């Protein structure tokens, strides 16, 4: 961990300057939205507890500020290839049939390329849903 000049701690997990809270937003944004809604507070508490135990205390307010701001990165990355992905699924008459937690994501008999596209759509659904929920829960507007 490297102390920054502003109130954040940096984690070089991905050889970049994403802060710790942003990394956790990244780690959790593919979780099932209902699961994250239910368990987010306990997950955050555990992360802060572990960092404190390891000698790197982070205040919950600082964590939440960086966490909610970090959702912007996931929102942008999630939408980056979305038009091409959805256009492809639409041209195959699949877009209209997608459902949350689509069982086709784990259909071993489906063409692997098509299954990958359906999984991509599900991951993007989770990304947008989780990011919007986090933004609402932790007052993104005020943090921004």
Map each language-model feature to its residues.
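Charged/polar, solvent-exposed surface patches and flexible loops
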Residues: 26, 49, 65, 69, ...
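All-alpha amphipathic helical-bundle segments outside canonical DNA-binding/catalytic cores
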Residues: 57-74, 116
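Alpha-helical, largely C-terminal catalytic domains
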Residues: 6, 30, 70
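Active-site acidic catalytic loop and adjacent metal/ATP-binding pocket
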Residues: 1-20
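Generic alpha-helical secondary structure signal
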Residues: 38-42, 61, 122
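Active-site activation/catalytic loop segments of kinase-like enzymes and analogous catalytic loops
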Residues: 14-56, 73-100
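ATP/Mg2+ or Mg2+-diphosphate-binding catalytic cores
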Residues: 75-144
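Helix N-terminus capping/helix-initiation residues
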Residues: 32-33, 59, 120-121
